Amino acid sequence: MCIRDRIYSIMGPSGSGKSTLLNLISLIDRPTSGSINFNQSPIDFNKNDKNDIFRAKKIGIIYQQNNLLPDFTALENIYLASLSLHNDKNLAITKAKHLLKLVDLSNRAEHYPSQLSGGESQRVSIARAIINDPEVILADEPTGSLDMDTAKDVFQILKDLKSSSRLIIFATHNRFFANKADCLLEMINGSVKNINV
């Protein structure tokens, strides 16, 4: 269904199935029927450990309510996500510092989540989601709890991450951001009702 170098938005009211669809794509939830393919290969949901590693390598996830670790700094929150796959702490820290610069938060590296604004926390979440250079970025209402100006900044960062080797899928109930995607899927009652390219 999805082509790389594209941003896909999934739009629909609360309860329409947007988050459920993202949870299925991210392998957090198991489908009750049908299958999920990645690069034209089906995912085997009987191999949970293998899927956890696959998700960590291939999929970056950004949530509406950031789930940053409260007792760790912004820098630590980012590089710890890399250590789940690699044991090279120095390399992880170097990558995390680069990503903080990318999201314009170098001056917040040693700040804890409680010291960050909502927009800053979301930018840390984006940096953490991409530290393993995933092929797919899933964002569940990434701008939902932000004021409009901050939301536009966060959305621009997502647009800047689009590349020939990566696709971005985000769920939203905000028509303004949904219309800025390359492809819009509208959901109602758990089904895709309309696709606008």
What residues fall within each predicted segment?
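Catalytic Walker B motif of ABC-type/P-loop ATPase nucleotide-binding domains
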Residues: 137-140
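Helix-to-loop junction immediately C-terminal to a conserved catalytic motif
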Residues: 26
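Conserved ABC transporter NBD signature motif
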Residues: 34-45
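A short, proline-enriched helix->beta-strand linker immediately N-terminal to the Walker B motif
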Residues: 131-135
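Short coil-to-helix segment of the ABC ATPase nucleotide-binding domain corresponding to the Q-loop/switch region
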Residues: 72-81
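ABC ATPase NBD coupling module
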Residues: 43-60, 163
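Conserved ABC ATPase signature
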Residues: 112-122
